């Protein structure tokens, strides 16, 4: 008797065949370019955002960010490859979801996790077996394991077996015409080896270079280190100037 394919193998097959439906939560300067890369790779993409103004613009074929021409959005919408929505239930149609919501600083200079928590709760309400969820928002080490994983497990899902959770930091440099979403290396750290495998396959479908790391905490720290390195160097050059 032949064993039925696991949730992991089934999702990997759908990613390979481009039959997986991809969700992107947060359609700003990170999420929209990522959504368009998935479209260009041959996927159907559902973009979710809480701003009805953004939804209306995108569905009218108009881009609201510098790095994505309106023509690109118009072609994706016309072809039926991309839809933007503020209807939470449509998250449940997705096989894999990238979360690219803001993490601004609060008045006390602490990270404001409200957008991440809202996205995590929305996903948990719509989650189903076989779903992959990847957090991209810049945040502190431990966020994926402490905030995202428990919400999915509270819905009866087992991370690493029937749902796959990872962190892959957004590294977009808005306005940079040389390094954009597709050719900027993508770091991926998952809760389990199966999570890393699925999330890496997801991004490898549309990103030139994918770099798996040992854990979501390692991937979360990569972004903080990169931001710190950049800030220190900018400050140093400004002082010398």
Regions found by a protein language model. Give the residues of each.
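Structural/interface elements that position substrates and couple domains in central-metabolism enzymes
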Residues: 2-241
């Amino acid at each position: 008797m032949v064993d039925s394919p696991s949730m992991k193998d089934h999702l990997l097959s759908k990613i390979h065949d481009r039959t997986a439906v991809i969700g992107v939560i947060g359609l700003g300067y990170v999420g929209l370019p990522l959504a368009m890369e998935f479209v260009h790779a041959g996927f159907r993409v559902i973009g979710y955002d809480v701003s009805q103004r953004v939804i209306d613009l995108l569905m009218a074929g108009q881009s609201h960010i510098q790095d994505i021409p309106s023509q690109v959005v118009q072609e994706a919408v016309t072809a039926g490859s991309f839809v933007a929505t503020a209807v939470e239930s449509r998250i449940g149609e997705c096989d894999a979801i990238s979360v690219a919501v803001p993490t601004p600083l609060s008045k006390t200079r602490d990270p404001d996790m409200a957008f991440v928590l809202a996205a995590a709760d929305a996903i948990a309400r719509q989650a189903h077996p076989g779903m992959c969820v990847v957090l991209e928002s810049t945040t502190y080490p431990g966020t994926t394991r402490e905030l995202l994983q428990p919400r999915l497990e509270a819905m009866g899902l087992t991370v690493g077996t029937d749902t796959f959770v990872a962190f892959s930091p957004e590294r977009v440099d808005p306005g940079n015409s040389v390094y954009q979403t597709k050719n900027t290396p993508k770091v991926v750290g998952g809760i389990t080896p199966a999570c890393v495998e699925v999330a890496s396959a997801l991004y490898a479908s549309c990103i030139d270079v994918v770099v798996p790391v040992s854990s979501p905490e390692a991937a979360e720290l990569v972004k903080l280190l990169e931001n710190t390195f950049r800030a220190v160097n900018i400050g140093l050059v400004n002082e010398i100037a």
